[in-house]
């Protein structure tokens, strides 16, 4: 901890224009708390984030970079736990790995922390699949820390999501939220991070259930938290898709934003997925695709425009996995009312009400009875129970390194 206090002290000493009162106000510390930090190294993780942001603002060095370095010098148990969650929620796998190695021989609550976050790390780096999470969590015993128990329950919901068991998630999420709300004042950082994780889980689920207002609210909370480009990109995807049937310009703006952010992330697979999502929306709205667009999307657009046969399209669509997008293509390309109604029924029975709505839109374009389609165009399923969210769920992450806010 001495490493951190010395770095902060030297920073303040080197900047004559920065007064102690200004620092205390920025970080949100009383005079006594300020003294305790420098004399005893006593400070909450949230206050460390504010110090990192202050130094970042004046030096140009990224606050995440500064904080990642500090996480390796923290000595108090509660703050170390927060460092683990910080590394996980910001998807900083290298930092999480170093924390796991640093604390691998601990006992008590820290041992529990290492056991839980080792599973998180293995999932992050791909050595553990989403379908294996529940079993991995089930092998953990004697976990007593309330935040860790809540995190374990959220991880189980990731497994349920991969298995397509949306109803089980809906049944359990309100209890998870109650448990988060009941966390004490010492667990404020965890409370906000766990709430963020609930938003991250429910944003795509609400979209699938065609509850677009909730989907947008959850996504806005994720964007405003400003945790990472990857998470913001995922949130812009949800917002963009939620406008797909109704507002071409808003839809394309948000999906383009998602794509641009994913390019910042630099992961080729994620970039390709974001580009696919943007181009899918372009096809849906009749916008000509670029030559570098996905070959199946271009084939679908050509078939819709009569440039290739439906037989050739189906041959092309057979290459690769079949997700909801490809199923949509296969069943709407020939504009057959019967085929599209069967597809609509299939999506609806699977409770994928958003894609059911997209097919209903295509049926409407093809001349099907709009009165019969009205229930499918408007149907949505609400998640039972109140999920308490705020746009500023993680207020201490809201300040970017440049000091500006992220807005939609």
For each predicted feature, which ranges?
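C-terminal non-catalytic interaction modules
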Residues: 1-17, 22-30, 259, 280, ...
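Generic helix N-cap/helix-start motif at coil->alpha-helix transitions
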Residues: 1-3, 43-47, 72-81, 107-117, ...
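Recognition helix of helix-turn-helix/homeodomain-like DNA-binding domains
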Residues: 27-45, 69-74
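Solenoid-like repeat scaffolds
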Residues: 38, 69-74, 100-109, 136-147, ...
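DNA major-groove recognition helix of helix-turn-helix/homeodomain DNA-binding modules
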Residues: 46-63
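Long, mid-chain structured domain cores
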Residues: 60-190
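Tandem amphipathic alpha-helical repeat scaffolds
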Residues: 77-89, 112-127, 151-166, 193-208, ...
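Helix-turn-helix repeat elements of alpha-solenoid scaffolds
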Residues: 85-99, 122-138, 161-182, 206-221, ...
């Amino acid at each position: 901890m001495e490493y951190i206090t010395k770095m902060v002290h030297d920073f303040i000493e080197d900047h004559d224009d920065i007064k102690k009162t200004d620092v205390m106000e920025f970080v949100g510390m009383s005079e006594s708390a300020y003294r305790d930090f420098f004399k005893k190294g006593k400070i909450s993780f949230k206050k460390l984030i504010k110090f990192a942001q202050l130094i970042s603002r004046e030096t140009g060095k990224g606050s995440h970079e500064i904080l990642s370095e500090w996480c390796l010098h923290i000595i108090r148990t509660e703050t170390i736990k927060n460092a683990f969650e910080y590394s996980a929620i910001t998807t900083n796998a290298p930092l999480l790995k170093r924390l796991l190695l640093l604390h691998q021989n601990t006992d008590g609550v820290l041992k529990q922390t290492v056991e839980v976050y080792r599973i998180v790390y293995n999932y992050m780096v791909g050595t553990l699949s989403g379908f294996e999470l529940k079993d991995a969590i089930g092998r953990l015993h004697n976990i007593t820390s309330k935040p860790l128990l809540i995190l374990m329950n959220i991880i189980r919901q990731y497994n349920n999501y991969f298995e397509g068991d949306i109803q089980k998630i809906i049944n359990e999420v309100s209890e998870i939220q109650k448990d988060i709300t009941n966390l004490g004042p010492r667990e404020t950082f965890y409370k906000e991070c766990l709430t963020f994780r609930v938003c991250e889980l429910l944003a795509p689920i609400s979209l699938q259930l065609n509850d677009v207002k909730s989907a947008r609210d959850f996504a806005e909370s994720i964007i405003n938290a400003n945790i990472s480009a990857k998470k913001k990109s995922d949130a812009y995807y949800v917002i963009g898709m939620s406008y797909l049937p109704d507002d071409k310009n808003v839809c394309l703006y948000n999906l383009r934003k998602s794509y641009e952010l994913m390019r910042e992330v630099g992961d080729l697979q994620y970039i390709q997925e974001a580009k696919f999502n943007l181009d899918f929306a372009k096809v849906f709205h009749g916008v000509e695709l670029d030559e570098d667009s996905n070959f199946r999307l271009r084939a679908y657009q050509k078939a819709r425009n009569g440039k290739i046969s439906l037989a050739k399209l189906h041959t092309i669509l057979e290459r690769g996995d079949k997700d909801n997008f490809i199923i949509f293509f296969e069943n709407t390309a020939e504009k057959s009312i019967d085929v599209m109604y069967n597809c609509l029924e299939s999506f609806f029975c699977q409770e994928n009400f958003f894609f059911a709505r997209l097919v209903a839109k295509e049926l409407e374009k093809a001349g099907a009875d709009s009165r019969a389609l009205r229930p499918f165009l408007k149907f949505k399923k609400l998640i039972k129970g109140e999920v308490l969210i705020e746009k500023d769920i993680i207020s201490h992450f809201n300040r970017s390194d440049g000091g500006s806010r992220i807005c939609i």
